[in-house]
Amino acid sequence: MKKIYIASDHAGYSLKSYIFEKLKKKFDIMDLGTNKKSISVNYPEYAHKLSKMVSKKKSNVGILVCGSGLGMSMAANRHKKIRAALCYSIKNAKLSRLHNDANVITLGERLTDKSLAMKCVNAFLNTDFEGGRHLKRVKGI
């Protein structure tokens, strides 16, 4: 069973909490913070924390949320073995797994409503890497 890690900064706290509540009954999921919306925090701290956990085991995946999803994506992608994808549609959430073997999805609370974000997360979690011609490309990342 895959382990899911989830984290956010203050700007992504509400969406992170919503996603966590929706997933906790069905998945082994760990919330790595932040735990307060009212206190401003630095998103790289949470992206690095989650990336370290996800990179420990191939089956681990992560969900990162900030205001736009961009900062979390950039910070997470600095880590070896992390392929973080900023997702804003169901199609690109699926393709991030299918073609790019993404192991972290990043979302922007200010840009993505809860319903679409949840659909993206479900697509991400329920899509496997296709391999084949994409394997060589992913190895080149």
What is each PLM-predicted segment?
Residues 3-4, 59-62, 81-83:
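Short active-site oxyanion
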Residues 5-7, 11-12, 90-141:
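C-terminal binding/interaction regions
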Residues 6-24:
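Glycine-rich phosphate/diphosphate-binding loop of Rossmann-like nucleotide-binding domains
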Residues 21-29, 81:
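Short helix-loop-beta junction
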Residues 28-40:
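A short beta-strand-loop structural module common to alpha/beta enzyme folds
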Residues 46-64, 68:
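Short, structured active-site "lid" loops
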Residues 64-106, 110:
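Mid-chain, well-packed structural core segment of small domains
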